[in-house]
């Protein structure tokens, strides 16, 4: 069995709980219980907490507020703790939009300071509950994005190392 990215999902139907989730992802205490404020971000880059709250307040009636955690496998995907988690998150959320055939609003924060596995918390506003097959598809999308990025980063590192070894050899001959 191939290790896969961890993709957890829970949901709420209340704006109050959604806002509590935003506070949590922005202000969860860091390592050694240190107070930390993390940047919130979405499709358009950095987002202020008041903007995230406004997004929740303006959600269509009946919206479902999904909380996702996207965490590349540290043993096979984020082996060097160097993956661009924002890119993986954006690819995953784009996959969700494709499945739902509509744009969705979401806010995220990267948590890379309090656990051995780096991860991203996302609060997404959806028109309906997701089914098990949707969640499995999102996990697959996150895994593929992480593995592809791992391959590209390892390839680039390998080429840089080879180039670095060849360069002194070339200099010796000229």
Regions found by a protein language model. Name each.
Residues 1-174:
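N-terminal nicking endonuclease/strand-transfer module with a His-rich metal-binding environment
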């Amino acid at each position: 069995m191939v290790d896969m990215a961890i993709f957890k999902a829970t949901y709420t139907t209340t704006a109050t709980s959604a806002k509590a989730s935003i506070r949590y992802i922005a202000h969860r205490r860091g390592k050694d219980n240190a107070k930390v404020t993390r940047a919130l971000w979405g499709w358009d880059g950095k987002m202020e907490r008041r903007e995230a709250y406004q997004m929740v307040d303006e959600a269509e009636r009946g919206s479902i507020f999904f909380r996702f955690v996207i965490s590349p496998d540290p043993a096979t995907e984020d082996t060097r703790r160097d993956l661009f988690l924002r890119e993986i998150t954006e690819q995953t959320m784009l996959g969700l939009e494709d499945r739902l055939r509509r744009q969705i609003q979401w806010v995220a924060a990267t948590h890379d300071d309090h656990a051995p596995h780096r991860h991203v918390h996302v609060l997404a506003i959806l028109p309906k509950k997701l089914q098990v097959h949707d969640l499995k598809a999102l996990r697959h999308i996150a895994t593929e994005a992480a593995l592809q990025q791992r391959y590209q980063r390892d390839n680039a590192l390998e080429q840089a190392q080879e180039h670095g070894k060849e360069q002194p050899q070339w200099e010796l001959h000229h």
